[in-house]
Amino acid sequence: MTTTRDYSSPSRAATAARTRRLIVDSAAELFVRDGYVATTMQAIAARAEVSVQSVHLAGPKAAILIAAFELAFAGDEGRHSLTERPALQEIMGHPDTDAVLAGYVRFLTEANKHAAAIVRVMRAASDADPLVRAAFDDLEERRARDMRLGAEWMVSRGLIHESAVAMAADVLGYLTGPDTYLAFVDDRGWTPEWYETWLDRAIRVLILDVY
């Protein structure tokens, strides 16, 4: 009697997942260091110490870049908004408003610390790759929604006027955005801790004291 071998065993799936994560992490390093266009599938394979075929199986280069952002930003792959993250939901539900603001700033600082450089790569690559452009545009739309939800939370706590939600969301998006983080930390040499302190103060002075 012939026995059919199970090729979808948990151990095989775990190995495939580890290989994919290695490929995506290696690609992320190269994308940030060398740029999207200059990073080849062969270079990714060499960095990850896997075959070029394995890299191609992980997806086209655009898909690997998108996965690199998702892993850096959220720790897993998928189209996640900030407001869907359990850690942020817990922070925003705290009854102490000052504690929420401190936790919110800390959360966004960590998110930028891990993902801002990849976002910069995505922005540059979006001019050359339609798949990256679509993913980047989707990211920007989700971020705008998250910022509006942040501003609406401020209204719910009596921190700003309801009529100021749209403008407050725009300012919040600029203050917490990856470009602002990189301008201070990468370009000007700030530490993430300095940025976190500045961001907390900036939100209070430029949003809460104004709107």
Where does each model-flagged region fall?
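Hydrophobic/aromatic-rich alpha-helical bundle segments in the mid-to-C-terminal region
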Residues: 154-202, 210-211
